Amino acid sequence: MKLRHLEIFYTVMTCGSLSRAAESLNISQPAASKSLKNAELKLGFKLFQRVRGKLLPSREALELFEKAQGIYQDLSNLRLLADNLARDPRAKFTLGCLPCLGLSLVPEIATDFYQQNSNLVMTLTAEHTETLVKKLDLREIDLALTMQPVQQGDIMATLIAEVPLVYVDKDYRQGAVEIDSIDQQRWISPGLDSLSTAIAAHRVFPATGLNVETCYMAMEFVKRGVGCCITDIFSARHSLTPEMIHQISPPMKIDLYLLRRADASLSPVTQKFVDFLCKRLRNELREINLELYPGNKKSIVSPV
């Protein structure tokens, strides 16, 4: 099947009639009919049967259409990639992050960077890691912040910070909590894979009566005194009052990774943001660590 035959076949399938397909392709109906007949001659079987003035796809056509849909999706992705390659990279960049970071850490840092760079065009998006990786592949975004060490294709993951985890509980008032002493009957599963994995390295909590898909939803229940949870310090500070946030003994952390394409250099403004981000994280996390765990002077941010 040649490309022009694929085009007329796919358009007839999606439009439902030869006349609408011809209109969509900006050709005459006789030309569309001739192209469809040529496709059937080339293939050696009928693609459509005319029944009461309507074109009904054959069994073979339905099977071909499944494959054709994938081809057209790839073409759509190719066009999107070409559009993204054509954009002016000099004073703009796009950052993706996890939803939990998009409600706490990222807006704070991005606001300060944006205000210091008046000629900047900055686009932010919040998605789960799998979607962020796809967007990096298509060059829809330049950078991504996630809590998973993705190693996939041309994607490079760099550890940029170790973020403290904290225990959140409206009713707890006894200082640092040992993870083994947390009441599993009150436990709210946070749902986030990377966070759950970090917690499971210290303790595996059995399934409970309350499970949520995001740490922010878990903290809404914590606010109401329904249960307790463990989350990152940035999300906790965004959602809860200080008396609901408690240290964990021994200290726990979750890794923060910067994702980018390994086969493409960063534009000057994107590199400037990366430097700004790492410096800001270094300073903030040093203060947070000393506040949570006095005497722990370890540097917890590594250079990119």
Swiss-Prot record:
Phenotype upon gene inactivation: Deletion mutant does not inhibit growth of B.subtilis and shows decreased adm transcript levels.
GO CC, alphabetical: cytoplasm
DNA-binding region in chain numbering: 18-37
Subcellular localization(s) per the UniProt record: Cytoplasm
Alphabetized GO MF terms: DNA-binding transcription factor activity; sequence-specific DNA binding
Keyword RNA-binding carried by entry: no
Induction profile: Expressed in late logarithmic phase of growth.
Keyword terms: Activator, Cytoplasm, DNA-binding, Transcription, Transcription regulation
Notes on activation and inhibition: AdmX-mediated transcription is inhibited by indole-3-acetic and indole-3-pyruvic acids. AdmX recognizes and binds the auxin indole-3-acetic acid (IAA), which causes conformational changes in AdmX that result in the inhibition of the expression of the andrimid gene cluster and the suppression of antibiotic production. It also recognizes indole-3-pyruvic acid (IPA), an intermediate of the main IAA biosynthetic pathway in plants and plant beneficial bacteria, which also prevents andrimid synthesis, but to a much lesser extent.
Entry-linked CDD domains: PBP2_LTTR_substrate
Gene Ontology biological process terms in this record: positive regulation of gene expression
Sequence ranges assigned to domain HTH lysR-type in this UniProt record: 1-58
Function: Positively regulates the biosynthesis of andrimid, a broad-spectrum antibiotic, by activating the expression of the adm biosynthetic gene cluster. It specifically binds to a region within the adm promoter.
Protein family (similarity comment): Belongs to the LysR transcriptional regulatory family.
Alphabetized PANTHER family for the sequence: TRANSCRIPTIONAL ACTIVATOR PROTEIN LYSR
Protein name (database record): HTH-type transcriptional regulator AdmX
The organism of origin for this protein: Serratia plymuthica
Lineage: Bacteria, Pseudomonadati, Pseudomonadota, Gammaproteobacteria, Enterobacterales
